[in-house]
Amino acid sequence: YWDATTQYCGTCGSPMRINTGISKLCDKCHREIWPQLATAVICLVHKGDEILLVRAHNFRGNFHGLVAGFVETGETLEHAVEREIAEETGLTVRNIEYFGSQPWPYPNGLMVGFYAEYAGGEVHIQEEELKTAGWFSIDNLPVIPEKLSIARKLIDNWLLRKGRTAE
């Protein structure tokens, strides 16, 4: 994707060539460029034996997932977690814990997963982003994302911490 969309220099319009394994160079103006990442965070918010699950308008299929969103320029990953949860659900969180990351099937995407404890607030969804949001107990989980997704890996790992597994 990156190679196909960076054939010409954005400064002078001349053809770009591979310079290193991860950069391109313009021979005319000597501008060097690297792939840009679109970094997003995703977070499993837990409260006792319950987790916060959402249904976003852009979800394909009838499943519930986790709050996620893009990191803004100049923002830490942890602040992005707090901001996205507050914006989409009205909740506050604490004790944010890194889980892992996964390349995301959005061009140049990287999804970074976290856990966070519920700190306060009532669920009030951002209707432009979400259809529904709510707390679900270990024993009453709805349809959740596919096993290959980082959302599912977060959920499965949380269930293992609780001595359980997903159906």
Write out the residue ranges for each language-model feature.
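Short, basic and Ser/Thr-rich N-terminal targeting/leader segments
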Residues: 3, 10, 37-39
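N-terminal strand-loop-strand
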Residues: 20-66, 70, 92-93, 116-118
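Active-site-adjacent beta-strand/loop module that shapes the phosphate/pyrophosphate-binding cleft
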Residues: 102-124
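The catalytic Nudix box helix
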Residues: 65-100, 114, 122
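Nudix hydrolase/Nudix homology domain
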Residues: 1-6, 17-18, 60-64, 106, ...
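Cys/His-rich microdomains that often coordinate metals
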Residues: 13-16, 33
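Short Cys/His-rich Zn2+-coordinating modules
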Residues: 6-13, 26-27
